[in-house]
Amino acid sequence: MEILAEHDQPLGDVRRQTVAVLFVDIVGFTRMAERMAPEAVVTMLRQFHQRITAQIFACGGTVEKYIGDAVFAVFGLPNVGPDDAANALRCAELMISTVAEWNSERSWEGESPLAIGIGLNYGPAVIGDVGCEQGLSFTVIGDTVNTAHRLQALTRSFETPLVVGDPLVGAVKMGPSSAAPLIDRLQDRGEQFLRGRTGAIRIWTRTLGNAET
C-alpha cells in the first residue's frame, strides 16, 4: 500500500501477475443495518474496517477497495512474493480471531455478535488503471478475483467463516513449511460449481473452534 502510494503518476501500464485475493464481509449486514440508526451503522463499519484493515496490513496485504461492509484485499502488490498465498490465509485466520475478540467486547456492551464470511483465491489477475483521464482508478480484475468473491458468498451455504479455493491451498503447500499448520485447519469439500462459472473448483472450508463462536 505504501509503495503504491509513492507513485506521483497513475500506473498507466496494464500488467498480469499472480496474486492472492481476499474478500471479507459481515454476514447478515443488510438486515442488521435496517434495525440500526444510520449513525450507529457508520460507527460499526468504521470499527469493523479498522480491525480488518489492521490484519491485512500486518500480513503484507493491500486494501484494493471498501464496498459497503465488504473489504477487497490483495496480496502480491506491487511485487509478487513466495509467501503471498500463505500471508492471505494467515490474514484470514487473524480476522477470525480478531472478530471473536471483538464479539467478546460487544457482549459486555449488550450488542449482538457479528459473523464474517471470507473468500480466498490465488492465481493470475490483470492490474492497472481503469476509467478516463478525468478519473482514473487503480484496480485488480480477472477470474481469480471473481472466484474469490463467489467463494465468499459460499460461506453462507457452508455455514463457515472461510472458503478457500484449491489454487491458494496448493500455493501454500508449495511455500514455506511454517505455513503448513494453516492447511491443517481446513477441510476438503471437493469440487463445487460457483454461480457465473462454467467449470467447478475444488474448495476448502474452515471449521470454527469453541472459542471462536
Where are these regions (language model features)?
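Catalytic NTP-binding/metal-coordinating core of nucleotidyl cyclase/transferase enzymes
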Residues: 9-90
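A structural signal for short, well-ordered beta-strand segments
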Residues: 21, 71, 116-122, 203
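Helical mechanochemical/support elements of P-loop NTPase systems and associated helical scaffolds
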Residues: 41, 48, 67, 84, ...
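Acidic/histidine metal-binding catalytic segments
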Residues: 67, 108-119, 161-168
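Short gly/ser/thr-rich secondary-structure transition/capping motifs
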Residues: 1-6, 100-102
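Cytosolic regulatory/linker segments at or just downstream of nucleotide-handling modules
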Residues: 125-127, 154-213
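Alpha-helical scaffold within the catalytic cores of cyclic-nucleotide enzymes
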Residues: 46-61, 77-118, 143-154, 181-185
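Catalytic strand-loop-helix junctions within cyclic-nucleotide turnover domains
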Residues: 74-84, 118-138, 155-158
